[in-house]
Amino acid sequence: MGIRIHRLRKQFETFTALDNIDLEVRQGELLALLGPSGSGKTTLLRIMAGLEHADGGQVLFGDEDATRMSVQSRRVGFVFQHYALFKHMDVFENIAFGLRVRRGNARWAEARIRARVEELLALVQLQGLEQRYPTQLSGGQRQRVALARALAIEPRVLLLDEPFGALDAQVRRDLRRWLRELHERTGLTTVFVTHDQEEALELADRVAILNRGRIEQLDTPAMIYDKPASPFVYSFVGAVNRIPGVLAQGQIQVAGHALPLANAALAAGPVEVYVRPEDLVPDQAGWPATVAWSQRSGSRLRLRATLEPSGNEVEVELPASAGSFQPGQQVRLAARQYGIFPA
């Protein structure tokens, strides 16, 4: 089931958390909400779940208006950053909790609850640990229990709030791969919040970049990285060089060289050229530059160079096989791809 957000607004006193957000999450999609602190990503997720209420706008699950629905009526699986497991319950009881608190006709028979929990233990690869308590589990195992508990109620959508934020780097990497495989098996519409760029770009089918309560760009990870829609996206996702230039008579003049202008709608005047370090390459037709320093890092070579005659410093990232560069060495650098925005 897909989710549609229409002109969603949320205000906390004088702070605008969400400013007329429009968003469509496709059925079966894994969507990341990525942005800095205060961008509105967690507020948006909590409104989807029914844990917060919007000041205006709509939340639709499929064709059903869920804007004023209770949390229970939405049938949403929600995973908190810090797991929110019950310490006095073992793994089995934690997973079964959402099924056991149901009342009336919604309550399952005990045999069905047990079968569902055993199915989920196999799905999240925790067979044999069902009698352990949360304090006896690793961080990664606790997160799997939290996911199994969210899935137990057979939710229509799955929402995750920074699911790997409390884990160390290696466990996060392992769990990312595992969650992607789990999503492929379940096909459940899933939205997760993160401030980790690598996590969003590796896991998601599409990424929504939020900033100051608005969506700056919604696109595939490849397009987010290669074709950022705004200076903010360029600067927030990955490293970038910003080089001042001027647009005049249909040409961009940057550091004494002309660059092709792809955006015909750009007005004449001062501009900034955004170039990622890996998109600057040695090329005899490029800008003259002087190497300030170089450093080998595994399979990559990082340089800092000063463009001439402008004096602008740029970071360059090359394959280690590109050779060695010494401070003071003269090079020429060309931009393979770049973005141009008004200064």
From Swiss-Prot:
The keyword Protein biosynthesis does not apply. Part of the ABC transporter complex CysAWTP involved in sulfate/thiosulfate import. Responsible for energy coupling to the transport system. PANTHER family: SPERMIDINE/PUTRESCINE IMPORT ATP-BINDING PROTEIN POTA, SPERMIDINE_PUTRESCINE IMPORT ATP-BINDING PROTEIN POTA. The gene is cysA. ATP binds at G35, P36, S37, G38, S39, G40, K41, T42. It is a peripheral membrane protein. It catalyses: sulfate(out) + ATP + H2O = sulfate(in) + ADP + phosphate + H(+); thiosulfate(out) + ATP + H2O = thiosulfate(in) + ADP + phosphate + H(+). One of its GO terms (cellular component) is ATP-binding cassette (ABC) transporter complex. This is Sulfate/thiosulfate import ATP-binding protein CysA. Signal peptide: none annotated. Keywords: ATP-binding, Cell inner membrane, Cell membrane, Membrane, Nucleotide-binding, Sulfate transport, Translocase, Transport. It comes from Xanthomonas axonopodis pv. citri (strain 306). GO terms for molecular function: ABC-type sulfate transporter activity; ABC-type thiosulfate transporter activity; ATP binding; ATP hydrolysis activity. The keyword Glycoprotein does not apply. Belongs to the ABC transporter superfamily. Sulfate/tungstate importer (TC 3.A.1.6) family. Its EC number is 7.3.2.3. The complex is composed of two ATP-binding proteins (CysA), two transmembrane proteins (CysT and CysW) and a solute-binding protein (CysP). It comes from the Bacteria. It is found in: Cell inner membrane. Its main location: membrane. Pfam families: ABC_tran (PF00005), CysA_C_terminal (PF17850), TOBE_3 (PF12857). It is an enzyme of class 7 (translocase). Residues 3-237 form the ABC transporter domain.
